[in-house]
């Protein structure tokens, strides 16, 4: 048990060091030897846990998504959970600007790196699955309009939240404005309830 805990600690230290480097220097500034030194291990130990740089990036993305998962509260109705998720993501990226910087760097890199593109796509699909599940449950319970296409709406929610993690969008009134409009459009702004309500297209 102690050895497993030590391995987990070492792996976590390496991931956090890589995460910090990307936030401070960008993806191009990520150096595995410096990551190992910052984590207090040698380069051989880093390669034991992360044989390739792509595996290290997977660890960084998982660390970032763990932060996003803290915004998913299990209490309340599905509609309440979705509204809280939207608002909590907004607060999270404002409180932890490194998170948006890291995700932005990796998103940009994914356009030129198939390995990172795969990692980011898998992350998007997992997030989409969670949001779609909340939407479907909210429709089933009568909290949202019955004609809602949960898959398409989930795609819009995830795209909006991903955009709000970017540094330029994570602060200022426009981000808040976009989030409020998204809540109203979906029907989770708390102003009304029931599957029969109508939404204006204006």
What are these language model-derived features?
Residues 13, 17-25, 67-71, 102, ...:
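Solvent-exposed, amphipathic alpha-helical segments
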Residues 59, 70-100, 150-157, 176-179:
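Hydrophobic alpha-helical connector segments
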Residues 116-121, 125, 139-189, 193-202:
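Hydrophobic/aromatic-rich alpha-helical bundle segments in the mid-to-C-terminal region
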Residues 7-19, 35, 60-64, 68, ...:
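Generic hydrophobic, amphipathic alpha-helix propensity
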Residues 10, 53, 60, 64, ...:
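Hydrophobic/aromatic residues within well-ordered alpha-helical segments
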Residues 13, 21-55, 59:
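Helix-turn-helix
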Residues 94-118:
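Amphipathic alpha-helical segments used for helix-helix packing
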Residues 24-25, 96, 141:
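Short coil/turn segments at alpha/beta junctions that flank glycine-rich nucleotide-binding fingerprints
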């Amino acid at each position: 048990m102690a050895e497993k805990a030590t391995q987990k600690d070492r792996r976590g230290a390496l991931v956090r060091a890589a995460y910090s480097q990307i936030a401070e220097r960008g993806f191009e500034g990520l150096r595995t030897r410096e990551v190992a030194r910052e984590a207090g291990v040698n380069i051989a130990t880093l390669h034991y846990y992360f044989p390739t740089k792509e595996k290290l990036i997977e660890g960084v993305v998982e660390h970032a998504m763990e932060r996003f998962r803290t915004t998913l509260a299990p209490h309340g109705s599905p509609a309440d959970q979705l509204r809280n998720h939207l608002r909590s993501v907004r607060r999270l990226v404002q409180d932890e600007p490194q998170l948006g910087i890291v995700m932005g760097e990796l998103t940009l890199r994914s356009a030129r790196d198939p390995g990172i593109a795969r990692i980011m796509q898998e992350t998007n699909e997992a997030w989409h699955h969670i949001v779609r599940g909340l939407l479907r449950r909210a429709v089933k319970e009568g909290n949202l309009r019955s004609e809602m296409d949960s898959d398409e709406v989930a795609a819009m929610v995830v795209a909006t939240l991903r955009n709000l993690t970017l540094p330029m969008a994570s602060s200022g009134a426009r981000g808040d404005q976009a989030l409020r409009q998204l809540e109203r459009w979906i029907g989770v702004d708390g102003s009304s309830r029931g599957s029969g309500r109508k939404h204006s297209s204006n």
